[in-house]
From Swiss-Prot:
This is S-ribosylhomocysteine lyase. Keywords: Autoinducer synthesis, Iron, Lyase, Metal-binding, Quorum sensing. GO terms for molecular function: iron ion binding; S-ribosylhomocysteine lyase activity. HAMAP family: LuxS (MF_00091). GO terms for biological process: quorum sensing. It comes from Campylobacter jejuni subsp. jejuni serotype O:23/36 (strain 81-176). Fe cation binds at residues 54, 58, 128.
Length: 164
């Protein structure tokens, strides 16, 4: 079975928080779809809390759209990684990593400004599959850590696994 692209990079060398352009694909009509690795935690060293990750999932995509979407960029989806060390963001267009990092930073500031749990979008039994599994406090802790550490840019060449 062929390796997925995410398993072709050396996770022991990944910095965090950091942005990595994981892939660019062309649609049949010629549009670019970019996939970004938004790494919140150093793999195998740290992990985002379950409730904090879930709450970020509800907040992050909307805030990133506010700061990154434009005439040439439209976010399709932002989803948490199963390992809980980050999120994958798929979008139409090819923004540079610095623009993505700036939008991510602004989105984390937005998370810190959410006044209370009732302000989390889609936090109800009709729109969320596990609506009891949220923590705004934990999401804010994750956001504050990102802001405190600063967001860097990953270099794919430095991360490439030898035989992948």
């Amino acid at each position: 079975m062929p390796l997925l692209d995410s398993f072709k990079v050396n996770h022991t060398k990944m910095p965090a928080p950091a942005v990595r352009l994981a892939k660019v694909m062309k649609t049949p009509k010629g549009d670019d779809i970019s996939v970004f690795d938004l790494r919140f935690c150093v793999p195998n060293k740290d992990i985002m809390s379950e409730k904090g990750t879930h709450t970020l999932e509800h907040l992050f995509a909307g805030f990133m759209r506010d700061h990154l979407n434009s005439d040439s960029v439209e976010i399709i989806d932002i989803s948490p990684m199963g390992c809980r060390t980050g999120f994958y963001m798929s979008l139409i267009g090819t923004p540079d990593e610095k623009s993505v990092a700036k939008a991510w930073e602004e989105a984390m500031k937005d998370v810190l400004s959410v006044s209370d749990q009732s302000k989390i979008p889609e936090l109800n039994i009709y729109q969320c599959g596990t609506c009891a599994m949220h923590s705004l406090d934990e999401a804010k802790q994750i956001a504050q850590k990102v802001l405190n550490l600063g967001i860097s840019i990953m270099n794919n060449k430095e991360l490439k696994l030898e035989n992948a």
